[in-house]
Each structure stands twice: as structure tokens, then as C-alpha cells.
């Protein structure tokens, strides 16, 4: 059964915001206040379709019809650990209804959201524009994620998508794009810097594109020789395969590590210039790493992390991507039980070229 628009509004919004009648005809959260979601099965290898109830909107909330959702490697890890969880945090959707205090988006807008669900908005990090570091932040894993056809989200943590960027490309930018751009922006990387990118996957291929557009000399570093041509096509000036003897004379000011597995850390430490910085972006498969101590000491090297990005930086990222025509390479699958299973299998086996999007 499909409810009329007026019924949907009264069901999910305590005080519905009036919308233009012509606009209403283009909006469609079907069968609200229930919606369809795809929950992880045992081991994250399968998915189960389920019906959930949309919560009532708070004053800052928006009800969103989901258009598509990218699949991050982090999603596969959560799906494997938490049976029944609805994962997905690279979400693109269309605003259907909004709470009375929502001012930053309008009904009908295409928006992106997903990794950060909320923060306290009161601590030193929130007040200084670094809310991604808020100790009370909640993330996609604290509720229902984007493998669904609808969602309710705090409008203060959504982003308007530039019209130049298609939804299927915008999804991966909300996390993968934000993560690599956040490192470039947050660590004040100069356009004259030489930047190495470790790993040529979802984050890595975007890191190459963003760093090249940033003006940097870009060195792609991968264990897979077959990815050399792709890396050069994406904008790398040089390619290093770690399975071969390292013969390059190039030293790097920064290395962006997007890889999720164990790595030959001694190789990367020795590729850094004096005072160089290794920035870790991916969720590690192991809880700790071993860094060669003496080279790090005598060359004053830094090993740091970078966690996605603040709202301000995410908006900057979308502006930059639109201006420089930066788009992820995507494989598209239907957002169905079968499509979720196939898409997640591609990501888990690290075969995706280069980001899976469910729509």
C-alpha cells in the first residue's frame, strides 16, 4: 500500500513543512512510514531484506529518498562483525520532507551524507570546526545505514551535491573523497610537494586524482604491477610496484596510506624526505604497526592519521571536485539482496574497479 503524500507527511513529521504542489509530484518515499533496508547476514556474506519504520522527524531532521550508496571497505568489516546491521555510509538521496528548523537544504535537493551521524556541537572540536574529532560523535554504525530506500538524518550533517556531479559519482566522494581531500587540506600539503599514494583502490585512485589536481607530483605505490597504467591514467607521474626492487630516486614529502592490510613499512619510511609525513587513512586490519625506529628518529619523520573530514572541508571537497572534474571510477549494482551480495563480494575480495555503488 502506498500512502498519499499528505499521509506520509503527517506520519513522519510532527509539524510538516508546506511544499509546493508541483514539487510534491516528483517526490516519492513509497509506503511510508515504513521503508526497505538490507541487513547483513552471517559473516557479512549475504543480506536480508527487511521492513523498518521511519522515525518521526526532529526539528533539524530531513526525510530522504535514497538514490544510491557507495560501498566502503569499512562497510564490509562492520557487516562481517555485526549480523543484522544495515551498513552503508556513502549515501546520496533526495530531500522529501524536513523539520521546522531545517534551513540549509530544501525539499527536492540532492544531498550526500553518511559517515558522521551527529556530534555534540558544544565541545572545543565542534566549536572550532573539527567536529569529526568530537569525542561524543556518532557514526553510521550507531543506527541504520544507507543500504535502504529511505532515511532520516540530521540536516546539520548533510551536504548539497553540486549539479555537475551525478549521484553515482557523488556517493563515493562523501567518504573516500572526503578522506583523501581531508588529508591534503588538513595537513596543508603544498602544491609543490611530492605525494606518494599507497594502495590503488577506492581511496587510492581518488587520492591520485585529487593530489594531481592539487598541483602535486604524485607517485602511485602498489603491490600490483597490473595497475600501473590505471595509476598513470588517473594522474600519477610515477608508479612503484613494491613486489619489485625499489630503484626510484624520488623522495616524498608525504605518503598517503590508503591500504587496509599489513605493509612493508620500512620501504615507505625510506621513501620519505627528512621531516616527511606518513598519513594513514584506511582502517587497519591489525591494531598496531611496527615502524623502523632509527630512520624515523634521525630523519624526524612523522606518522599520523586523518579521519574523514569536517563538514566545512567536505563542502570544500565537493566544490573542488566539481571544478576540477574529479569523479570516482564506479561499478554499479542494484540495491537488492543479490546486488548487495555481489557488490560486497567485489569489495571484500579487493576486485572492485574502483568503487562499488548500489542504486
Language-model segments: which ranges?
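C-terminal hydrophobic helical "lid"/dimerization subdomain
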Residues: 2-33, 311-359
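Glycine-rich beta-strand-centered segment in the early N-terminal region that forms part
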Residues: 53-69, 78-124, 157, 162-165
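NAD(P)H dinucleotide-binding glycine-rich loop of Rossmann-like/cofactor-binding domains
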Residues: 78, 118-198
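Conserved beta-strand positions in the Rossmann-like core of class I SAM-dependent methyltransferases
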Residues: 96, 219, 279
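Adenosine-nucleotide cofactor-binding segment
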Residues: 191-200, 212-267
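N-terminal Rossmann-fold NAD(P) dinucleotide-binding loop
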Residues: 204-205
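Glycine-rich phosphate-binding loop and adjacent beta-alpha segment
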Residues: 262-329, 334-337
Amino acid at each position: 500500500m502506498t500512502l498519499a503524500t499528505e499521509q506520509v507527511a503527517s506520519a513522519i513529521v510532527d509539524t510538516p513543512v508546506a511544499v509546493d504542489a508541483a514539487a510534491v509530484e516528483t517526490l516519492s518515499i513509497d509506503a511510508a512510514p515504513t521503508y526497505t533496508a538490507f541487513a547483513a547476514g552471517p559473516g557479512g556474506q549475504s543480506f536480508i531484506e527487511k521492513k523498518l519504520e521511519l522515525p518521526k522527524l526532529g526539528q533539524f531532521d530531513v526525510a530522504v529518498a535514497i538514490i544510491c550508496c557507495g560501498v566502503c571497505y569499512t562497510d564490509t568489516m562492520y557487516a562481517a562483525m555485526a549480523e543484522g546491521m544495515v551498513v552503508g555510509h556513502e549515501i546520496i538521496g533526495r530531500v522529501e520532507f524536513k523539520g521546522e528548523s531545517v534551513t540549509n537544504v530544501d525539499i527536492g535537493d540532492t544531498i550526500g551524507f553518511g559517515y558522521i551521524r551527529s556530534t555534540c556541537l558544544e565541545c572545543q572540536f565542534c566549536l572550532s570546526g573539527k567536529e569529526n574529532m568530537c569525542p561524543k560523535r556518532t557514526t553510521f554504525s550507531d543506527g541504520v545505514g544507507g543500504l535502504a530506500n529511505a532515511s532520516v538524518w540530521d540536516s546539520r550533517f548533510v551536504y548539497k551535491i553540486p549539479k555537475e556531479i551525478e549521484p553515482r559519482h557523488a556517493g563515493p566522494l562523501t567518504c573516500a573523497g572526503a578522506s583523501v581531500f581531508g588529508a591534503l587540506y588538513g595537513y596543508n600539503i603544498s602544491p609543490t610537494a611530492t605525494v606518494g599514494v599507497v594502495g590503488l583502490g577506492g581511496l587510492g585512485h581518488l587520492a591520485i586524482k585529487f593530489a594531481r589536481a592539487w598541483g602535486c607530483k604524485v607517485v602511485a605505490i602498489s603491490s600490483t604491477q597490473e595497475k600501473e597504467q590505471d595509476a598513470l591514467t588517473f594522474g600519477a607521474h610515477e608508479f612503484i610496484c613494491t613486489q619489485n626492487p625499489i630503484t626510484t630516486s624520488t623522495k616524498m614529502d608525504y605518503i598517503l596510506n590508503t591500504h587496509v592490510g599489513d605493509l612493508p613499512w620500512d620501504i615507505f619510511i625510506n621513501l620519505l624526505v627528512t621531516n616527511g609525513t606518513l598519513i594513514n587513512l584506511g582502517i587497519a586490519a591489525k591494531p598496531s604497526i611496527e615502524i623502523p625506529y632509527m630512520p624515523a628518529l634521525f630523519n624526524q619523520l612523522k606518522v599520523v592519521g586523518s579521519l574523514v573530514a569536517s563538514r566545512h572541508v567536505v563542502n570544500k571537497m565537493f566544490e573542488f571536485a566539481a571544478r576540477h572534474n574529479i569523479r570516482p571510477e564506479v561499478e554499479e549494482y542494484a540495491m537488492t539482496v543479490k546486488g548487495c551480495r555481489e557488490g560486497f563480494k567485489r569489495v571484500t575480495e579487493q576486485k572492485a574497479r574502483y568503487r562499488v555503488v548500489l542504486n
